[in-house]
Amino acid sequence: MIPGQYQIQPGDIELNAGRRTHSLTVANSGDRPIQVGSHFHFFETNDALTFDRAASRGMRLNIPAGTAVRFEPGQSREVELVDLAGLREVYGFAGRVMGALD
């Protein structure tokens, strides 16, 4: 093995396998672009984003880690969300949960 070398199994890796997903239509009602990262608790995003906020509680964007989705002013788009995993506790972000989700 060469230092730093990766040994990866052949084939595709399925992200978030077996987790519940939900699609939502999201619109930016503000006058500035809003960018949401892959692991941000979607329920707590900028208030200028209009969508069914209650349906997004305990979920994040179903996109690869380290990436983001940008919502331009006046733009509406459909996004897919995926359940948060692990302990399902949320702290920080906009401070709207600060504890267990379930």
Swiss-Prot record:
Q: What is its EC number?
A: 3.5.1.5
Q: State whether keyword Amino-acid biosynthesis applies.
A: no
Pfam families named in the record: Urease_beta
Give the main EC class.
hydrolase
**Recorded family membership:** Belongs to the urease beta subunit family.
The record's InterPro entries line, in alphabetical order, gives: Urease_beta-like, Urease_betasu_sf, Urease_subunit
Under the heading Gene3D superfamilies, the entry gives:
Urease, beta subunit
- MF annotations from Gene Ontology: urease activity
Pathway assigned to this chain's UniProt record: Nitrogen metabolism; urea degradation; CO(2) and NH(3) from urea (urease route): step 1/1
Task: Give the range the annotation lists for the signal sequence.
Answer: none
Where found in the cell? Cytoplasm
What is catalyzed by this enzyme? urea + 2 H2O + H(+) = hydrogencarbonate + 2 NH4(+)
- Identify this protein by name: Urease subunit beta
Subunit annotation = Heterotrimer of UreA (gamma), UreB (beta) and UreC (alpha) subunits. Three heterotrimers associate to form the active enzyme.
Q: Which UniProt keywords apply?
A: Cytoplasm, Hydrolase
- Keyword Hydrolase listed? The answer is yes
Organism, by scientific name, is Pseudomonas syringae pv. tomato (strain ATCC BAA-871 / DC3000)
Question: Sorted alphabetically, which NCBIfam families does this protein's record hold?
Answer: PRK13203.1 (NF009682), urease_beta (TIGR00192)
